[in-house]
Amino acid sequence: TSKSQFIGVLDIAGFEIFDTNSFEQLCINYTNEKLQQFFNHHMFMLEQQEYAREMIQWDYMNFGLDLQPTIHLIESTSPIGILAALDEECIMPRASDDTFTEKLTSTWSPPKSGPDAASSKFLPSRQVRRFIVRHYAANVEYSTDNWLDKNRDPLNDHVARVLATSAQPFISVSYTH
């Protein structure tokens, strides 16, 4: 019999880095970060725990990719993360893309030196209305131009009606008003 050797590579969500990265790229890269964290946890951490339970001999592998700090930066509510800060700015009377960027910078900028400086997932940019996120794949500089307007865009009525008819109670309840 002939043996077939195969290595498959799946690009889960397609990390995006362009010359100018905006809200859409943050959403895509955030999704990719979450999926990669899920994959790492389930394929590596849980699998090694299963080996230990079954007393299978193996060499422990530290994959060293805990993506939670970056995920926390994006989705945290305390301290306020990128998405929560964006939602908050959208309801403020005199909010702008500038005030949004300033809020992120004042909340997340690392100290100039020390251990937190090197491990911070947020970096201020030298350019106006921009910030940098240290994703696992690369550092990405995001332009916050028009983020408040993009976040205020209403959900399409047809999409909301379709989601309201979902067989999954969590989804249908979320879109029934």
Residue ranges and their predicted role:
Residues 1, 8-175:
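Extended, low-complexity interaction tracts enriched in P/G/S/Q
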